[in-house]
Regions:
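Conserved Rossmann-fold NAD(P)-dependent oxidoreductase catalytic core, especially the SDR/UDP-sugar
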Residues: 90-139
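Conserved catalytic-site region of short-chain dehydrogenase/reductase
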Residues: 76, 111-121, 168-175
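A hydrophobic C-terminal alpha-helical subdomain
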Residues: 193-194, 254-297
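Mid/C-terminal beta-alpha module of Rossmann-like enzyme folds, strongest
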Residues: 209-270, 302-316
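Substrate-positioning beta->alpha
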Residues: 145, 176-177, 194-215, 220-221
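Conserved beta-loop-beta element that borders a ligand/cofactor-binding pocket
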Residues: 147-171
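N-terminal Rossmann NAD(P)H-binding glycine-rich loop of SDR-like oxidoreductase domains
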Residues: 2-24
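NAD(P)H-binding glycine-rich loop region in Rossmannoid oxidoreductase-like domains
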Residues: 31-90
Length: 316
């Protein structure tokens, strides 16, 4: 049996769907009852459990020879730090402790544990060292702590491999956790843009990359799952979104300090915590995953097209 935590989230749902298409027996862990019912229709065994429920996690992971630890919290404000650490760090530690020590454990970290880079020419690789001030970014700090538990377990002999996906987008995110910048831009609510950039990757490719990691990844190693042509500045990202949708919106290009100051006055739709991440450079190099596990991300133009069309269709 394969155990998938965070199975009711955007990536988790896609991973379970792929595993079931392959005929794999899946135990899908999550908290969203409606999404769990959807997973049951796919033939997965739904288990309603949270990452702070030790007894529930132990029972859910029992008998699983492969664990995909996808569950995680995404938030960026100082006030979220304790919640982030509880889920992304302590949740990982608990699952490693409670799951079968003989099971292969695929830990989903993030490029947030490796970056940001110093500029658009500083591509994040698996050996990239994050800057000293990364601890000021609550999400990054929590993912670094969780990844540390996973890598320490590997050093102690556990069969653990780490995935570091970049910014995940794609069709099907009904909650809007990854598509809100697109929605805000198309509605004319993102009136300014600033320096910085991100690396996009398709959720469908990350799901297939995780399966490839489980099959071919080396224990104790990281693998960046990112689009090979996914590195885009914010200005280029929104320009492409506007062209695909046929709705180009005017944006003022602001220096990072001014953009950060504006979030204090106008916190919506961009909060100060999110802006601190967005004004950095998160460009990535997925060469290792492509070379060692056969990771083949689709062209990012295809992903953007599918995503924007999904956003437009779901807004009608």
């Amino acid at each position: 049996v394969i155990c998938v935590t965070g199975a009711t989230g955007f990536l988790g749902l896609e991973l379970v769907r792929l595993l079931r298409e392959r005929g794999e027996p899946v135990r899908a862990l999550g908290r969203d009852e409606k999404a769990l019912q959807e997973l049951a229709k796919l033939g997965a065994e739904p288990v309603r459990v949270s990452m702070d429920n030790a007894e529930g996690l132990r029972d859910a992971a029992a008998g699983c020879e492969l664990v995909y630890h996808v569950a995680g919290l995404v938030a960026h404000e100082k006030r979220d730090r304790n919640r982030l650490l509880a889920t992304n760090a302590e949740g990982t530690r608990k699952l490693l402790e409670l799951s079968d020590p003989r099971a292969r454990f695929v830990h989903v970290a993030s490029v947030a544990t490796l970056g940001p880079g110093t500029g658009p020419g500083d591509l994040i690789s698996e050996s990239h060292i994050p800057p000293a001030d990364v601890d000021r970014l609550p999400y990054s700090a929590s993912k670094i702590a969780g990844e540390r538990y996973a890598l320490e377990a590997a050093q102690a002999g556990r069969d653990v491999v780490v995935a570091n996906p970049s910014y995940i987008i794609g069709p099907g995110d009904r909650r809007g956790g990854t598509t809100w910048p697109i929605r805000a831009y198309l509605r004319g609510r993102l009136r300014f843009v600033t320096s910085g950039g991100l690396c996009l990757v398709d959720v469908r490719d990350v799901a297939s990359g995780l399966v490839a990691l489980a099959e071919r990844g080396k224990a104790g190693e990281r693998y960046i799952l990112a689009g090979r042509d996914g590195n885009l500045s914010h200005a280029d990202f929104f320009r492409e979104v506007g062209e695909i949708a046929g709705r180009r919106r005017f944006q003022v290009n602001l220096p990072p300090r001014l953009a950060l100051a504006l979030t204090t006055v106008f916190p919506w739709p961009v909060t100060r915590g999110y802006a601190k991440i967005a004004t950095r450079w998160w460009y990535c190099d997925p060469a290792k995953a492509m070379r060692e596990i056969g990771f083949e991300p689709r062209p990012i133009e295809e992903t953007l097209g599918d995503t924007v069309r999904f956003v437009l269709d779901s807004s009608r």
